Amino acid sequence: MDIIETAKLEGHLESQTNNSTNTYTSPTEAVEEEDKNGKGKPKTLSNGLRKGAKKYPDYIQISMPNDSRNKLPLEWWKTGIAFVYALFNLILTTVMITVVHERVPPKELSPPLPDKFFDYVDRVKWAFSVSEINGMVLVGLWLTQWLFLRYKSIVGRRFFFIMGTLYLYRCITMYVTTLPVPGMHFQCAPKLNGDSQAKIQRILRLLSGGGLSITGSHILCGDFLFSGHTVVLTLTYLFIKEYSPRHFWWYHLVCWLLSAAGIICILVAHEHYTVDVIIAYYITTRLFWWYHSMANEKNLKVSSQTNFLSRAWWFPIFYFFEKNVQGSIPCCFSWPLSWPPGCFKSSCKKYSRVQKIGEDNEKST
């Protein structure tokens, strides 16, 4: 009797197993069955899993978070604000030069201050023209390079903010301390003695000529502390080197020679005191390096007791411009316009291969 009952129980279990097998076929059995028919392929396994999952959804779907946020948003409207900021300080500088010019003492009454560089190097008349030409060449190179940058909006707002801040500092220094002319060769324009209309004309003349001697617009005196020419020569070189490929060493060397020669020619021409050039170089390089260190380091973007850089007066402005920029800007170029054919477009060159693979994965998804 025990044998008969055991046989019945095994038959009952076998029938239940067959019924469940008829309703659901495991992927492994499907593969084995198709292997017998000579059609076993890796593709059948994935199909079996897919069909089984759809028919019997006894699983938990875990949705992975997709980081769809752009780590380098362009935000051109912020670039426009930075441009207005730089333009305002540039106009303010011309106004301040016009005001300070009225306070410059005559060179007959207040001779030039002693300067060690002038004691050892005689004045060369054409040297200042070389300095201004070098500055225009560097500005042209930087403008061309900036137009081909992929993230030109982020780089542009950095340039405009730093340039505007430097000229704001220059307005303050030249206003609080008026130095006598650095050489007896200076031919300053006559004082206007309160003629507002003539002062406005001088401001417009300075703006139209860029404040350059070779354009005939540099006729006012008093803007000696600190040198605006040194600011332009230094800042353009720093941006050219920072946002160009590292293996363009020859390009960096040429730009460095143009910048260094231009700064030396300012002193050789006796157009600025040596202290003017030193202060301009120091303030320009410090502000550039501080800003980019804070922009590239996430921890320095947060105001805290240990972050002493956040105590700068311009930190709120910096945070407004850089709060959505995650990480450093890759050296990536693109055609500035969308109309040229594809043969003229070059692929972006990045230093990080991992970043390139990440962007390819984002495009595929």
Swiss-Prot record:
Record-annotated active site: H229, H272, D276
A single MF term (Gene Ontology): sphingomyelin synthase activity
Keyword Amino-acid biosynthesis: no
Top-rank taxon: Eukaryota
Any one annotated GO CC term: endoplasmic reticulum membrane
Membrane-spanning parts: 80-100, 128-148, 159-179, 219-239, 248-268, 273-290
Region spans: Disordered: 9-50
Location relative to the cell: Cell membrane; Golgi apparatus membrane
Name of the protein this chain belongs to: Phosphatidylcholine:ceramide cholinephosphotransferase 2
Source organism of the structure: Rattus norvegicus (Rat)
Lineage of source species: Eukaryota, Metazoa, Chordata, Craniata, Vertebrata
